A protein has these predicted regions:
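A short glycine-rich, hydrophobically flanked beta-strand micro-motif that places a catalytic Asp/Glu
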Residues: 32-37, 211-213
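Short acidic active-site motifs
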Residues: 39-41
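A mid-sequence, solvent-exposed acidic-amphipathic segment
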Residues: 165-191, 198-202
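FMN-binding flavodoxin-like domain, especially the glycine-rich phosphate-binding loop
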Residues: 3, 13-16, 23-35, 47-179, ...
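Surface-exposed charge patches
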Residues: 23, 43, 98-99, 199, ...
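Iron-sulfur cluster-binding cysteine motifs and their immediate structural context
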Residues: 191-214, 220, 224-242
Length: 300
C-alpha cells in the first residue's frame, strides 16, 4: 500500500500537523510521501492507495485548495483522509472537503481537526489559541496517521463498516470576513529584485512584470502578500476591520472555544487575560515584513 499526504500551510501550523501524521504513517507502513500542493502533480495521485489532504480552514475549504482538488483525476476505489487547522470555528471545512474528495471517487476513511495559533492581521495578538500546536497536538496527529493506515488496511480487506458517516453540511454561513482592499505603492515596491507577493499569491492573480502591474484590489483574501512584503509596498487600511474582527473574537470565537473547552476538545494554553484585545496582529508586528517565510518554505 502506498500513501501520500498533500497539504497547504500558510503559517506553518498545518505543515507541522501533516509531518506529524506522516510520521505515524511511516511507523505503521514504512513509507509515506508528503508534498505541498504547490509542488503537486495531480496525475501522480493515481499511484497511491491512501491519500491525505491537510489545510487550514478559512471559513471552509480555501478557494485555491478547492480549485486544486477539482483538478484531481478520478480515483475510484482508493482511500482518503483529511484534516484541518483553525483558530476557533473549523466546522465547515470537513463536510466540504469530504464531499470534494468523494466527487473524485475516493472513500474517505477519517477526518480530524486541530486548534492552532492564528497569524491574521485583524485578529488579536496574543490570540486565544496561541501555543498550539504543541507536543500533545503533534502526538495526536501522529496517532491519527497510524490509525488511518490501520483503518485503510481493514477497509480494503472488507470491513466497510469502519467507513465513517459523511459529516452533515452546515446551513449557509451568515458570517463574512471584511473584504481585503489593498493597493500597491510602486514607489516602495522592489520588483524585480523582490517578487514574494507574486510568487506566493494563492490565486496567482498578481503579475508585477506587466506595466502597469496587475494587482487586483480585492481577492480571496489571505492577507499574505501584505504580511510578507519587506517594504510595506502593499498598503491596506486595517483600522475599522480590526475593530469588527476583535468584536467577533470577544464574542463568537470566545464562546466557541469555551464550549469546546468544556467538552474536552480544546486545551487552553493562553489565558484570556493574556489575549491582546487592543493589539491586532498588524499592530503587534508594526514593521515589515510582518511575517518572514522560513527558508525551507520558500517554494511552498
Amino acid at each position: 500500500m502506498k500513501c501520500i499526504i498533500i497539504y497547504f500551510s500558510q503559517s506553518g501550523n498545518t505543515k507541522k500537523m501533516a509531518y506529524a501524521a506522516r510520521e505515524g504513517i511511516h511507523k505503521a507502513m514504512g513509507q509515506c510521501h508528503i508534498v505541498p500542493i504547490t509542488r503537486l502533480d495531480v496525475r501522480d495521485l493515481v499511484g497511491y492507495d491512501l491519500i491525505g489532504v491537510g489545510s487550514p480552514c478559512w471559513l471552509g475549504v480555501p478557494f485555491h485548495v478547492e480549485r486544486l482538488i477539482n483538478t484531481i483525476p478520478a480515483l475510484s476505489d482508493k482511500h482518503a483522509f483529511t484534516f484541518c487547522t483553525h483558530g476557533a470555528k473549523g466546522e465547515r471545512f470537513l463536510p466540504e472537503m469530504v464531499r470534494l474528495l468523494m466527487k473524485k471517487g475516493l472513500t474517505v476513511i477519517g477526518t480530524r481537526d486541530w486548534y492552532c495559533s492564528v497569524n491574521h492581521p485583524l485578529i488579536p495578538k496574543p490570540y486565544l489559541t496561541d501555543g498550539h500546536p504543541d507536543e500533545i497536538d503533534l502526538q495526536e496527529a501522529e496517532n491519527f496517521g497510524r490509525e488511518m493506515v490501520e483503518i485503510s488496511r481493514r477497509v480494503y480487506a472488507g470491513e466497510t463498516n469502519l467507513i465513517p458517516e459523511v459529516p452533515p453540511m452546515l446551513p449557509p454561513r451568515t458570517l463574512s470576513r471584511p473584504q481585503f482592499k489593498k493597493k500597491l505603492n510602486t514607489k516602495k515596491c522592489l520588483y524585480p529584485e523582490c517578487s514574494l507577493c507574486m510568487d506566493h499569491c494563492r490565486l496567482k492573480i498578481i503579475d508585477l512584470s506587466q506595466s502597469p502591474p496587475v494587482f487586483p484590489e480585492e481577492c480571496q483574501p489571505c492577507y499574505f502578500c501584505e504580511l510578507i512584503c519587506p517594504t510595506g509596498a502593499i498598503e491596506a487600511d486595517y483600522e475599522s476591520d480590526a475593530e469588527l474582527e476583535t468584536g467577533r473574537a470577544k464574542t463568537m470565537f470566545t464562546e466557541a472555544l469555551e464550549k469546546a473547552e468544556a467538552e474536552g476538545r480544546f486545551r487552553r494554553l493562553t489565558p484570556v487575560e493574556k489575549v491582546g484585545w487592543d493589539t491586532p496582529f498588524y499592530k503587534f508586528f508594526r514593521t515589515h515584513p510582518r511575517y518572514v517565510i522560513p527558508e525551507d518554505d520558500r517554494d511552498e
